[in-house]
């Protein structure tokens, strides 16, 4: 992408990266931010590490841009000077982008190569020792739940709670609830294992949680930065309604050994899927040979979703959707600009993505 930028920025094409909700929290050691300031710190750090020349924009914590542009985690858009989207892809493709720009703006020869750009790899943030505490092995797919965080005393969220539910709990109210405490590398802190492990307390009405009091493992190493993970059983929950009140207590120590302080965090967790919560790659189930199951081809999956989206919005089944009634990417598929999106236009729009 940086190579394409160098070729087409002089031609007046403006490029932007947009930071959105993390699709896979934990990748490269990055923990999902809890506020906008933390997102901006991620942007600053990533830009410095990569040596990027392309400017960055940052979505707000309500993820309005992500929602408006179709929710794809790695999407790509070309917008003309009048504000019209002339090309879009649910998955960024630099080679196809270069072809589009060659057609729209003109071909550039010779092309800048990746080697000429000399980008630095995005290494994980430096932390205290990891690999000390074994990770929790989960069976089946887990889904992130909606979490609202509160912290007593105004301290940063040195550790961040992630809560996930299995399919049975999310749909039927009975199942397993995963809780993970992840130290945020932004704050350069570690667990002080000499003063005791983190503690978690779960309070909920008319729902049974076993156990409802949790304590992290005893660790011989004096410090580490591994996640603290727990799995509890839930019975008689109400999907979409049950609220878990969760209190977390731990001692945070900075890596420079300038402070150690007790921290209390409070969370409200709703038994409902967080559409912006992403998925942890380390939590995805693996096949017996240790590999993750193959997923459907991205293009096939996109066309399946596209057909479903059009069918859902075409309520009278006449093959036409009024543009003002369209949502998400359908808003941009009115190729002849007559105020309507036909099934044929939608197919052509998706073919170009």
Label for each model-derived stretch:
Residues 291-312, 323-331, 343, 348, ...:
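EF-hand Ca2+-binding helix-loop-helix modules
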């Amino acid at each position: 992408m940086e190579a394409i930028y160098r070729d087409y920025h002089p031609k007046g094409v403006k490029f932007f990266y947009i930071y959105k909700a993390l699709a896979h929290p934990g990748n490269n050691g990055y923990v999902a931010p809890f506020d906008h300031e933390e997102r901006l710190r991620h942007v600053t750090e990533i830009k410095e590490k990569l040596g990027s020349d392309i400017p960055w924009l940052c979505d707000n914590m309500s993820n309005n841009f992500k929602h408006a542009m179709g929710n794809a985690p790695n999407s790509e858009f070309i917008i003309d000077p009048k504000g019209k989207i002339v090309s879009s892809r649910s998955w960024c493709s630099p080679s196809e982008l270069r072809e589009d720009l060659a057609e729209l703006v003109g071909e550039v020869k010779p092309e800048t190569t990746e080697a000429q750009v000399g980008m630095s790899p995005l290494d994980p943030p430096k932390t205290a020792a990891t690999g000390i505490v074994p990770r929790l092995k989960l069976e089946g797919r887990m889904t992130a739940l909606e979490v609202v965080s509160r912290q007593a005393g105004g301290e940063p969220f040195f550790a961040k709670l992630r809560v996930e539910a299995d399919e049975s709990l999310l749909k039927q109210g009975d199942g397993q609830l995963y809780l993970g405490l992840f130290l945020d590398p932004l704050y350069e802190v570690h667990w002080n294992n000499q003063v005791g492990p983190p503690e978690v307390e779960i309070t909920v009405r008319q729902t049974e949680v076993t156990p409802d009091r949790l304590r992290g493992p005893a660790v011989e190493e004096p410090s580490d930065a591994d996640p603290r993970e727990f799995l509890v059983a839930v019975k008689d929950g109400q999907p979409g309604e049950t609220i878990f009140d969760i209190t977390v207590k731990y001692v945070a120590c900075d890596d420079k050994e300038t402070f150690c302080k007790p921290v209390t965090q409070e969370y409200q967790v709703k038994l409902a899927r967080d559409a912006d919560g992403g998925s942890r790659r380390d939590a995805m189930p693996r096949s017996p040979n240790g590999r993750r199951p193959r997923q459907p081809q991205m293009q096939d999956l996109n066309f399946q979703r596209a057909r479903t989206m059009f069918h859902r919005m075409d309520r009278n089944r006449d093959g036409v959707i009024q543009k003002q009634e369209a949502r998400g990417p359908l808003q941009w598929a009115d190729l002849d600009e007559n105020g309507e999106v036909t099934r044929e236009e939608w197919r052509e729009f998706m073919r170009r993505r």
